[in-house]
Amino acid sequence: MEGKNLTSISEFFLLGFSEQLEEQKALFGSFLFMYLVTVAGNLLIILVIITDTQLHTPMYFFLANLSLADACFVSTTVPKMLANIQIQSQAISYSGCLLQLYFFMLFVMLEAFLLAVMAYDRYVAICHPLHYILIMSPGLCVFLVSASWIMNALHSLLHTLLMNSLSFCANHEIPHFFCDIDPLLSLSCTDPFTNELVIFITGGLTGLVCVLCLIISYTNIFSTILKIPSAQGKRKAFSTCGSHLSVVSLFFGTSFCVYFIPPSTRSAQKDTVASVMYTVVTPMLNPFIYSLRNQEIKSSLRKLIWVREIHSP
């Protein structure tokens, strides 16, 4: 292996989905449509929350941050893929690949953290409604969101620096449409034990904390809802967390298929297709889930559209 320390390589090649020109044209159109819908939908949710003072509550503060994370998340991977299809190239620079890895890990973990924080918010709202305003103070909300951003920025930086310390062999082809950590580790010609150990410890710990927060919060939520005597009261209580539960199921369900399925039953093609679900489809569906199942969001959207019609010439 001497003389083959290739950490200074200039680029990787993202194999993506297909090399057939006709299939690439179809993929370009599909992903461009999904990307535009995702960014527009999430930015619209943020705009609605900012402009409607009635939505200036902890729940919608967290939702605005989740929408921002979704818009950034999809912007980390899809634009580069679209650009490569457009210029008929599979190349991504070494620094560009590490930069993509950094932001991908930042936003995927940030999404998990924010969903856990939102579950805690719903727990307090349903299980301790009389103390909700006192517990979910503006200071605590800002702290929870700021801590999520900072912790995940540092967590992503750690993994990116460790990846940069590896040497890569002659094969620079990544069987994926973006620079994910597992495909990159498989290309290393040096022992990635340290990287894998850090992934196991930090990734396992942060993932466990998020999942436990979700499980504990929703266990208490469902327990409280079942104790409500009237059916109308149960429906009203469940409606406050139904949208969030749908998003949680979609995000964690699809990401589970990529990272927790035994390697013996996985393939690069299956992982790539499954990755589309939580990197592209989930961020695209989130605004629709919240707008269709949330009466306050729908009402604010109607008011925003009505105001624009009134002021339009």
Swiss-Prot record:
- Residue numbers on the Cytoplasmic membrane side: 50-57, 121-140, 220-236, 293-313
Where does the record place a coiled coil?
none
Q: How does it sit in the membrane?
A: Multi-pass membrane protein
Q: Main localization of the protein? A: membrane
Q: Which InterPro entries match?
A: GPCR_Rhodpsn (IPR000276), GPCR_Rhodpsn_7TM (IPR017452), Olfact_rcpt (IPR000725)
| Family matches, as PANTHER family | OLFACTORY RECEPTOR
Name the family the entry cites: Belongs to the G-protein coupled receptor 1 family.
Transmembrane helix among keywords: yes
Q: Which GO terms describe its molecular function?
A: G protein-coupled receptor activity; odorant binding; olfactory receptor activity
Q: What is the lineage of its organism?
A: Eukaryota, Metazoa, Chordata, Craniata, Vertebrata
Matching entries from Gene3D superfamilies are given as: Rhodopsin 7-helix transmembrane proteins
GO biological process per UniProt: G protein-coupled receptor signaling pathway; sensory perception of smell
Q: What is this protein called?
A: Olfactory receptor 1G1
Residues carrying a glycan: 5
